[in-house]
Amino acid sequence: MITSELFGTAPCGTPVHRYTLNGPEICVRIMDYGATVLGIDVPDIPGNVRDVVLGFDKLEDYFDNPACFGATIGPVANRTAGATITIAGTDWHMPANEGTNNLHSDLEHGLHKRVWDVELDETHNAVRMTTSLEDGELGLPGNRTFTAVFTVTRTGVFRIEYGCESDRATYVSMTNHTYFNLAGHNAGMDCEHFFVANAAHYLPINEQNIPTGEIAPVEGTPFDFRELRPVAPGMEADDPQIKQARGYDHCLCIDGYQYGRNLRRAMHVEEMWTGRELDYYTTAPGVQLYTGNWLGDEHAKDDANYGWGAGFALEAEMYPDTPHQPLFPQGIVGPGHPYSNVIEYHFMRH
């Protein structure tokens, strides 16, 4: 069942609505401003239900949301060196919003700052959102139509399907930037998360947090999550990569990528005190693991104050800076070649 309610008004004057999708042992709240995930309620072992998604109570707080809580990021997620992408021999320039580089396309006018059009699909318990960009808008070519379909299935799986069609060759890498704390969004560091990643390689970064181009083995590094291990010790490891990012802010290269055709489990997360678990699936080649290294004391929902490490984000996407790295899986989108990225969240308790 889907419910809808007025949540407020965007700066442009457009009404913003909040949508609630219910399923077995899960309740998901989203909004059409930024195609944003607002909250996910799931039970622990004894049946205590908590919201495990970081965010705000009020719509107005999302207007200034540098952490991008819950947001749909695009058209290009993560970092792009020099804020420039070359497509078909032409250089296209995005805003240089992190030094000389670009982060998340445009932090002021990106997809997470728009009110998306909405169509409800009661039959499939889904909310379909669409928005568009004109040729050259946000610094990239093509008249582009973006879609985000949020579904809660009959088995309680939360599914996001991102898509884009363009009338010209362009580059797209969308993701969702939801932060999780499986002990409860306001648990802070009073939690114990253990991770497994289906990733034998990761992408080292340079002093500007841009991938160096190397696809490095995880063995012998803090990025080796091939077997269940706690994430907290790695966040403070005596490792130059960890120190550079103040924790994890690196792309894990998920095994078994087949150019977006296969949905596979990328990550498994367990919170030991509550027994909540998350299986994270995607069709994307990589998952940016970000451990909230730059979270400040945002005044958040339920009067929580988030700080360093208060939550983690799993960002399924193309590898960061792919247009400049010929060894990375490429993803040019154009006529007859649409973009797709499917993400699934399977919550459990054991």
Describe the function of each predicted region:
Residues 1-350:
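An exposed, glycine/acidic-rich loop-and-rim segment of catalytic or binding clefts
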